[in-house]
Design a protein with these regions (language model features):
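A short acidic (Asp/Glu
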Residues: 49-53, 142-150, 188-189, 243-246
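Helicase C-terminal subdomain and adjacent C-terminal extension
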Residues: 3-34, 38, 56, 202-264
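Coupling/hinge elements of helicase-like and P-loop NTPase modules
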Residues: 37-77
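Conserved helicase/translocase motor-coupling segment
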Residues: 63-152
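Conserved ATP-binding/catalytic motifs of P-loop helicase motor domains
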Residues: 1-8, 110, 141-143, 185
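The feature marks helicase ATPase cores and/or their adjacent C-terminal helical subdomains
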Residues: 46-58, 161-165, 251, 261
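Conserved motor-coupling elements within RecA-like helicase/translocase cores
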Residues: 159-191, 198, 208
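Structural motif
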Residues: 136-137, 192-194, 225, 233
Length: 264
């Protein structure tokens, strides 16, 4: 369970790479002082072991009981974007039709690439009549809004994408784009993840990873990594070696997951 936080309640101008977070204790944390705990060991969500193996090792001490997969294909796709740039400061971005405003804490190339990936996923789903839901998750509100705008804009030119969005709107698993804080409780067949952070225009990767750097940031990552039932599409501008060792547990977990996704 994620503890409550005011991290994402700040205004749109708040620079979310600063790592300023105020967590309160969760209800479960408070209850532990009064009640005994018992682990629920059977894992049912992930249809492929590779979607849960990382969390099983790093968070559950390999205590989860995971049904074997029907095939050996690794269910996580690592889309590394070598030329992407993370802009922590405010900038102006325009799409093909109009300006979509000024904002900081965004990665434009990553937003475009993940939007293209989502649109392609939607088109294939409709053309091949494959019923599969999807959700996009990223690290802050600015990138969330940018990705959502890119997808909605691209979908106006792709009838299949519009059909897909409308088809899922009336279900329990509608298409949406969320930030890291708001994805707890969600699940979809496929999760698209924009890790957002990366080198700046000078080629320097700052070690500020927003809510991930918080003392409980690793728990947010665990929630993120375990939302997918069939597959996870990772879009990242980072390689594991640019993340320094040390610091909060969230940073080391983030680095380990990038390595896990890239080496399969």
């Amino acid at each position: 369970q994620l503890p409550p936080t005011n991290f994402f309640n700040a205004s749109s101008e708040f620079n979310t790479d600063d790592g300023i977070v105020d967590d309160d204790e969760s209800i479960l944390d408070l209850a532990l002082s009064k009640f005994s705990s018992r682990m629920l060991r059977w894992h049912y969500r992930s249809k492929h072991e590779s979607l849960i193996n990382f969390s099983n090792y790093h968070f559950y001490q390999n205590n989860l009981i995971i049904p074997p997969s029907a095939n050996d294909k690794f269910a996580i796709t690592n889309n590394y974007l070598k030329k992407a740039i993370y802009s922590a400061s405010t900038l102006k971005k325009k799409n093909a039709k109009e300006s979509i405003g000024e904002r900081g804490g965004v990665n434009i190339i990553e937003a475009n690439e993940i939007a293209d990936g989502v649109i392609a996923f939607m088109r294939e789903s409709i053309k091949k009549n494959i019923k599969r839901s999807c959700l996009v998750v990223t690290m802050n509100n600015s990138q969330r809004d940018l990705i959502d705008e890119e997808i909605r804009h691209k979908a106006t030119k792709i009838p299949e994408a519009n059909t897909y969005i409308g088809m899922w709107d009336e279900t329990m698993e509608p298409f949406t784009v969320k930030n890291l804080e708001n994805v707890q409780g969600d699940e979809r067949d496929y999760i698209f993840v924009s890790t957002l952070f990366g080198p700046n225009k000078e080629g320097i990767t700052m070690q500020r990873f927003g809510p991930i750097n918080h003392p409980k940031g690793h728990r947010r990552l665990n929630v993120l990594f375990t939302r997918a039932k069939q597959g996870l599409e990772l879009y990242t501008s980072l390689t594991p070696n640019v993340i320094r060792d040390g610091g909060e547990k969230g940073r080391s977990i983030f680095k380990s997951y990038l390595d896990y996704a890239a080496t399969q």
